[in-house]
Amino acid sequence: MTGDNHLSPRLPRLTPQRREQRRERLCQAFAAAVDYAIAHHARIFAHVGDLFDHQTPSNRDRAFVAGELARLRQAGIICVAIGGNHDTPRMQTEHGGAGPQWVYAALDGLRYFGASDVLRPELLEINGLRIAVAGLTNNPVAPPGSDPLAHMRVDDPKGALAQADVGLLLLHAAIEGMSMPNEGERTVTLASLDALDPGLNVVAAGHIHRYAHQRIGGREVVVTGSTEVMEFGAHAGGAGFAWLELTREGAQHIQHIHLEAQPRKDITLSTENLWPENRLFRTGVTGKVVGRDAALLEAPQTLPAAMPLETVMRELAGCTPETITRLRITGPLTRDQYHELPVREILRLGQERAFSLDLDTRDLYLFDPAAGDFEPTTGIGPISLLDELDALVAARRQSASGAGDDLDAAARLLRERISAAEGERGQ
C-alpha cells in the first residue's frame, strides 16, 4: 500500500535541472514500491491518493506511471486506487472534475474509486480469499475539518461486503488519534470508523505523510505515509510504504518498508547570530529591548563580529549538492540591518552548496533601539515591502530637489507591482 507520492511537482523555485532531478527522485521512490510488490509476489497494489502533486502532471510523469502500472499488471497484481486532495480537481469545470487516474482506469490499468460520497465495493477473489475493496476519493469542496465518512452511503447491489472474507477501505484523510490536531484538511472520527460496516475490517489512509498503525475497534487502521519526505520537521516522518497480508481474520504482518529519503537540513539563525551586538538590546533579566544609550554603556570592547554572510556560510558547510535546506532567520533587527541582510548572496550560496535553499524570513521584525524600552513583540512588526517603500520615498523626498513628481510616479508603480506580487503569493 502506498500513497502521497506527489509526482510531477511544479517546484518553481528550483532551476530546471534541479527540478528534473527532484522529480526523478520522486519517480524512483514510487518505482521502489512497485519493485517491492513484484519481488514479494503481492496480489493487490493499493494506492491511497495524491499519486500526483497536482491535476496536470507532465506527460513524462504520466507515461512513467503508465509503465509502472503495466509492470504490475504483467506480474498479475491488481491495482486499486483513490484520488487525493492534490490530484483531484477542485471544480467540475476543471478537466470535467476528473483526476489523471481516470486515464489509467479507462485503459484497465487500475480500478479507480472516483466517488467522494458513496462507497461502491468490488469483490476480488485471490487464491480462494474473497476481498471486498472500496474507496472514497477526496471531496475537494468539502468544508475543512469535515469527516468524509459522516454522510457517506454504501451502494452494494451485488452484496460484495456480505460475500467477502475480508474488506479493505481506502481513504485520503487524517484519522482521529493518529494525527495532530488540525493537521489534515479532513478527519475521520473514531465514531465514523465504529459505524462502518463490520465487513470493512482493514482501513488504509493517505494524506498524512507519517506511517502509523493502530487497531481501532477491531479494525486494523494503517496510514501508509509518503514515499519521499515532503516537508521539514519531526512531524514529516520517514519515507516508505506499507506492506500487509490479508487473511480471513483480517490483516497480519503489517509493517512499514523504509525508503532512503533525500537528505535535508533545517537551520535556524537568530539575528543575534548574525549581529552579536543585538544582544546588547536585551537585558539579562527581562529580555526587554532597551535604548541605544544603555546598550552603548554595556558594550564591551571586542573585535568586530563576523559578517552575516560568513555566519551563514559556516552553517551551510555541512550541506551537500543533495541536501534540501531550509534557513530560517528570526528575531529583531534594525532598519539598517534589514537593508544590510545579504539575501541575494545567501540564495547564491544555497544554490552552490545545497540542492536547494528555502530562505524563510517570516519571523523577522524591525525595532528601533533609540525608541526606549519595549518588548520585541510590540516592535514595528513583520517587515512589509510597502512600508519600506514609504520610508524610502520619505527619505528621498527630504533629500531630492525638484524631482517630486517623478518620485511619486515611481513609487505608485512600485506599490502596484508589490501589491500584485503579494496577491499572487496569497500574502
Which residues fall in each region the model found?
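A short, well-ordered alpha-helical element
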Residues: A32-H41, R153, K158, A305-G318
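His/Asp/Glu-rich metal-coordinating catalytic cores
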Residues: I44, Q55-A70, Q74-V222, S226-E231, ...
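Accessory, non-catalytic peripheral segments of nucleic-acid enzymes
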Residues: E249-Q427
